[in-house]
Amino acid sequence: TALLIQISTEVGAITSQSDKETVRKLKMIGHYIGMSFQIIDDVLDFTSTEKKLGKPVGSDLLNGHITLPILLEMRKNPDFKLKIEQLRRDSERKEFEECIQIIRKSDSIDEAKAVSSKYLSKALNLISELPDGHPKSLLLSLTKKMGSRNT
């Protein structure tokens, strides 16, 4: 996700014939926005509902993806780390549910949101360095909207 958004902002800057410094800034803005977006997506995988997500809660874990909230919890909770290491695709659903509930009840969700916010802040700082105009205000608006994303 981060790479896709990064490439999009970079290619947009190149095709609009921006100078090298603006291309570099827009590339980094895309990277930071993409990282923030992906982390929020990882958080929503635990905090949202199946109806809102359009997929089962915890589907990243069910599919074997170790996301930031999981990594953060593994780092501070050895029992949880062991549970994750023992999970297999054919593990019983209740084993996955246990891990999902541990994440939901932990502060790893808030920690991941804080990391996402840091990336968003870096993007906003770089956006503030861009020349004033309609493209800048659109990018600023989009970035702020991403920070309040809940689906």
Specify the residue positions occupied by each region the protein language model found.
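All-alpha prenyltransferase/terpene-synthase fold signal
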Residues: 1-151
